[in-house]
């Protein structure tokens, strides 16, 4: 697991996690960048680490806006990684 994927999983595992890619970018403190975050989340979705859902957007185009939630598999992978360093997911 690389640091960018780890950052996204940590942010999604918080008690009140950011769910939209733009919120993830903002809360990462500059670690996640705009174009790469969308590719990262799609790759993590393919691996089964996050679930992708859609919500109706109130914008002028009436499009659906994707949001992401960490899966059990993603949480287990994160906990396993943190255990190697003696850390616990709170």
Task: Name each model feature, range by range.
Residues 1-11:
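Short alpha-helical segments that sit at the start of domains
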Residues 64-68:
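Short beta-strand micro-motifs in enzyme catalytic cores
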């Amino acid at each position: 697991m690389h640091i960018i994927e780890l950052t996204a999983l940590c942010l999604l595992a918080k008690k009140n996690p950011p769910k939209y890619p733009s919120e993830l970018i903002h809360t990462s403190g500059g670690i996640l960048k705009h174009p790469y975050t969308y590719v990262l989340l799609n790759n993590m979705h393919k691996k089964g680490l996050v679930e992708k859902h859609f919500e109706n957007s109130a914008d002028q185009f009436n499009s659906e806006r994707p949001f992401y939630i960490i899966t059990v598999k993603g949480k287990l992978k994160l906990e396993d990684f943190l255990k190697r360093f003696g850390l616990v997911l709170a």
